[in-house]
A protein has these predicted regions:
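FIC/Doc superfamily catalytic core
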Residues: 1-272
Length: 272
């Protein structure tokens, strides 16, 4: 019996999602433009993505300081800029390489250079993992290390299938958010999972829609709404098996939360 085209990403409520997408998405996307401050050697919007994705993870850096560092070469203490530089490098790599299993691992190697020891960079974890809140509560438990490889194989299958599939721009946003969500719930790396998930979402958008996707300030919006971002993830249940056994949780996450995560980036583009 042949395997289903999609092995891990549910799409049963795609139609319900499409009813909520704001109008004018394609026109707004087409109108995105690079910032005047950008040069061949410096990307303003890649800096925005790197700074705010890092701030979600607790890095203490502001955009103005990072631009001074990245564009004008102003020196800061290494601890202030190293991890953001690493993530910037991963974004630049993604912008010039196809989205596939090998390159996802390479992007993680780049963004995790100052997060984890070299032997764990770009390699799937082999131990239990959970995400905790600042007050010590368990936010959610990631996939068991015994199934991480098989779950990621399913995700890579779905990425490959979706990259070949013709779809409307609204559908692209739907699947991009699902990739982000399922990746972060699997939590395949020892560290750098959130950064990787946000990069993966935008990488998929760019592969399907073109390089203008890199100009969307989705990471900034996720940071500005990070409480809702984590509240939505919390709706999916504490344990990873709850995610895969009750797909209605994903649909609730997508279609009924006060600010569905897969509409945030669409809102960003239209409002910009």
């Amino acid at each position: 019996m042949p395997k289903p085209a999609l092995q891990i990403l549910p799409d049963a409520l795609l139609a319900a999602y499409l009813e909520q997408v704001p109008s004018g998405l394609q026109e707004a996307f087409d109108a995105l433009q690079e910032a005047e401050i950008s040069t061949p050697d410096f990307s303003f919007y890649t800096s925005v993505a790197s700074v705010f994705s890092s701030k979600i993870e607790g890095e203490e850096i502001d955009l103005d300081s990072y631009i001074k560092h990245k564009k004008f070469g102003i020196a800061f203490l290494p601890d202030y800029t190293q991890k953001i530089d690493d993530l910037y490098s991963a974004y630049i790599f993604a912008q010039t390489n196809p989205l596939n299993q090998q390159n996802i691992a390479e992007a993680h190697k780049r963004l995790s250079r100052h997060l984890i020891p070299q032997q764990y960079q770009g390699r799937l974890r082999t131990h239990n993992m959970y995400v905790s809140t600042p007050d010590g509560r368990i936010e959610y438990v990631a996939a068991s290390p015994y199934i991480v490889a098989q779950e990621m194989d399913k995700l890579y299958n779905d990425i490959s299938y979706l990259l070949k599939k013709e779809m409307r721009i609204e559908e692209v946003f739907f699947y991009a958010s699902l990739l982000h969500l399922v990746f972060v719930k699997i939590h395949p790396w020892n560290d750098g999972n959130g950064r990787s998930a946000r990069l993966l979402e935008k990488w998929f958008l760019a592969q399907k829609l073109g390089e203008k996707a890199w100009l969307a300030q989705s990471e900034k919006m996720y940071y500005q709404q990070h409480a809702g971002y984590y509240n939505n993830i919390r709706m999916l249940g504490l344990e990873y098996p709850e995610l895969v056994s009750d797909r209605k949780r994903i649909f609730y996450f997508q279609c009924r939360s006060s600010k569905p995560t897969n509409l945030i980036i669409a809102d960003v583009i239209i409002r910009d």
